[in-house]
Amino acid sequence: MFLRRLGGWLPRPWGRRKPMRPDPPYPEPRRVDSSSENSGSDWDSAPETMEDVGHPKTKDSGALRVSGAASEPSKEEPQVEQLGSKRMDSLKWDQPISSTQESGRLEAGGASPKLRWDHVDSGGTRRPGVSPEGGLSVPGPGAPLEKPGRREKLLGWLRGEPGAPSRYLGGPEECLQISTNLTLHLLELLASALLALCSRPLRAALDTLGLRGPLGLWLHGLLSFLAALHGLHAVLSLLTAHPLHFACLFGLLQALVLAVSLREPNGDEAATDWESEGLEREGEEQRGDPGKGL
């Protein structure tokens, strides 16, 4: 019976623990018939305990067995309670050990947050930090915000977001004129190059023909216009024949112009700009009020 109860308390890894049958409140007395008819010899009715050795067989042997069987559960109960208390103590010791092992693993992996108390100012406000419970406290209004990275700033500036830092030297209208001015300057450069190529030959041809004076100048201007017009037509036909190549070339040139035009001015450039503006204002004041200058 003692081994059966001990087996019920011990854990069984191979299956469920079988429910223990409740023990009877008291053992049923067994009637022992010590008559000579049922017993084969005198040894059958011998006492089972060491205390009864040497006593003669009497009629009260059944009562002694009943009292011995009743004393067995009372002896077994404190032993079972001691085993249960030892098992609970071992579980209590295992829990802090396992918790310390888990905390050591988390610290080795870098997953455990370092807890610290928030510093309390004189006004009673807490500074942002990690709360003792392990959660992040909400940053106050005076806490510094995270600065965006350089890449995010560049992307925001390229997209023209409203929160991006403004690097424009002038207003938006002045910035929009950069691309139009570039196209205009390219056309002017092309036209001036064509005029420079055909101006001298036309002038020499008119001089050989003896066409000088106002008539020669008029003919020189008209012939230069026609030569530049045909030259522009030839160049534009070449550009329209290969639009992708020239568009890439124009885009690269425009990117270089925008990078130079929209860059932030340095300290020296800003100082020179302020000095030039101050000189211009002084000159305007002197021009407006000549009497004050004297």
From Swiss-Prot:
Positions bearing Phosphoserine: S34, S35, S71, S90
Bias (Low complexity) occurs at: 35-44
The source's domain of life comes to Eukaryota
InterPro entries with a match to the protein in the record:
DUF4661
Among Pfam families, the record links this protein to: DUF4661
Record keyword Transmembrane present: no
Q: Where is this region: Disordered?
A: 1-148, 268-294
Q: Residue ranges under compositional bias (Basic and acidic residues)?
A: 52-62, 73-92, 278-294
Residues in a coiled coil are none
* Transmembrane helix as UniProt keyword: no
Q: What are the protein's UniProt keywords?
A: Phosphoprotein
PANTHER family in the record, alphabetically? C6ORF47 FAMILY MEMBER, SI:CH73-25F10.6
Q: What is this protein called?
A: Uncharacterized protein C6orf47
- In its UniProt entry, the species of origin is given as Homo sapiens (Human)
What gene is this protein translated from? C6orf47
